[in-house]
Regions:
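Short intrinsically disordered, low-complexity coil segments enriched in acidic
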Residues: 1-10, 79-80, 142, 160, ...
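N-terminal subdomain of lithium-sensitive/metallo-dependent phosphomonoesterases centered on the IMPase/IPPase/PAP
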Residues: 1-32, 87-89, 96-99, 129-132, ...
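Generic detector of well-ordered alpha-helical packing
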Residues: 11, 31-34, 65, 152, ...
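Short secondary-structure boundary/capping segments
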Residues: 17-20, 62, 105-108
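DPxDG-like acidic metal-binding loop motif
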Residues: 20-84, 88-96
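An extended, acidic
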Residues: 94-167
Length: 167
């Protein structure tokens, strides 16, 4: 389907900033976040889409195809997770219908330890130092290694406390 707004994507046509700075509203799309994870076939890749108005993101979608999980947030509405999504070919699906099928985040229950999530493919010495400092501060720290924007979803969902990124 066509959109009245331009689409900015690293896989798409390169547009000079002189052209892009005039865009009041645009889509930003990463159709394959976690390329290394996709190549490894470990399922830790996502499709990321954002709608930006006047340089402010107003809607974001992260889809995890292998898990059939859809994370989405809309300004003024909240953040949600919908499981079991195969496709949204029906153009008649409304935001309200999606919200009704979803769970509002954060979802996680209380726990007795701190959880950090880090990149599976880009674990830096700075991140390792930061996690060591977390262990000194919190004692019991669990480290979850994951790929793509799944790490951000885990924090949004409440399943992780922090995603340190220094690169």
């Amino acid at each position: 389907n066509e959109t009245p707004f331009p689409v900015l994507s690293e896989e798409g046509k390169h547009m000079d900033y002189a052209v892009r700075r005039g865009w009041d509203t645009l889509w930003i799309v990463d159709p394959l976040d976690g390329t290394k994870e996709f190549i490894k076939r470990n399922g830790e890749f996502t499709v990321n889409i954002a709608l930006v108005q006047n340089a402010v993101p107003v809607m974001g979608v992260i889809y995890v195809p292998v898990k059939k999980e859809l994370y989405f947030a809309v300004e003024g509405t909240g953040a949600y997770k919908c499981s079991g999504i195969v496709g949204l070919e029906d153009e008649g699906v409304t935001l309200q219908q999606m919200i009704e099928k979803s769970k509002r985040m954060p979802l996680a229950d209380a726990r007795d330890h701190f959880i950090a999530v880090a990149s599976r493919s880009h674990l830096t010495p700075e991140t390792e130092t930061y996690i060591a400092d977390l262990k000194k501060k919190h004692g019991n720290v669990e480290l979850i290694s994951s790929g793509s924007s799944i790490k951000i979803c885990l924090v949004a969902e409440g399943k992780a406390d922090v995603y340190p990124r220094f690169a």
